[in-house]
Swiss-Prot record:
This is Imidazole glycerol phosphate synthase subunit HisF. Belongs to the HisA/HisF family. The keyword rRNA-binding does not apply. It is found in: Cytoplasm. It comes from the Bacteria. It comes from Myxococcus xanthus (strain DK1622). It holds the Pfam family His_biosynth. The keyword Transferase does not apply. IGPS catalyzes the conversion of PRFAR and glutamine to IGP, AICAR and glutamate. The HisF subunit catalyzes the cyclization activity that produces IGP and AICAR from PRFAR using the ammonia provided by the HisH subunit. NCBIfam families: hisF. The active site is at D11, D130. Pathway: Amino-acid biosynthesis; L-histidine biosynthesis; L-histidine from 5-phospho-alpha-D-ribose 1-diphosphate: step 5/9. Its EC number is 4.3.2.10. The gene is hisF. It catalyses: 5-[(5-phospho-1-deoxy-D-ribulos-1-ylimino)methylamino]-1-(5-phospho-beta-D-ribosyl)imidazole-4-carboxamide + L-glutamine = D-erythro-1-(imidazol-4-yl)glycerol 3-phosphate + 5-amino-1-(5-phospho-beta-D-ribosyl)imidazole-4-carboxamide + L-glutamate + H(+).
Amino acid sequence: MLTRRLVVCLDVKGGRVVKGVQFEGLRDVGDPVELARRYEAEGADELTFLDISASAEERDTLWELVRRTAEQLFIPLAVGGGVRTVDDVGRALRAGADKVSINSAAVANPALLTACAERFGAQCVVASIDAKRDGDRWRVYTHGGRKPTDLDAVAWARECVARGAGEVLLTSIDRDGARTGYDLALTRAVSEAVDVPVIASGGAGSAAHVRAAFQEGGADAALVAGILHDGVTTVGAIKALLRESGLHIRSLT
């Protein structure tokens, strides 16, 4: 039976965890290492660091942060944001990341996914896709959701996997931070189109929304952030509901 995963996302800027709505209006929510340890203790299956500053000046700060966090964690740590080259991926993995998500750089140069998969293995390469509803399809955006492309999200997900991505992190820009639930139609469309795990992201407002991502969206994993940072719910409460609903998840014991 498929074990579903609960992934906690920490958006990092200037060495701190921040949160906003639709990638805007950021506020400070805490120290990354402390929050990572807390969420692991609560039962998170995986952690994702997204460097949303993506500035060269702060890149060294990020690697040091990854190193400090990875030393404290036993669960997998994924890192993304501003990853542009094979060397960037190598640096993240050497700092202690288990996986690296690639977004804008893959759109600019799709061969980067193949190069990274060949060098480090597909299991280390996550295609991060930010998508926004556009009529009867979803358009891919880059640069933190600011720059529209001509790519269709479902077709792009297929291409990313064909080029070597071992996982897809799929974020609905429309739902990001809105807490109205994941975009289940988008999640299902991509989940049905690829044969690698899909992480649903953007819109979690309750444990029931997470359950819907699995049961209705067909996701393999669900990413949560703001509702945990703000104490709306807990990892334990989400997992309890998933377990009651018959979904197979990892327990703390």
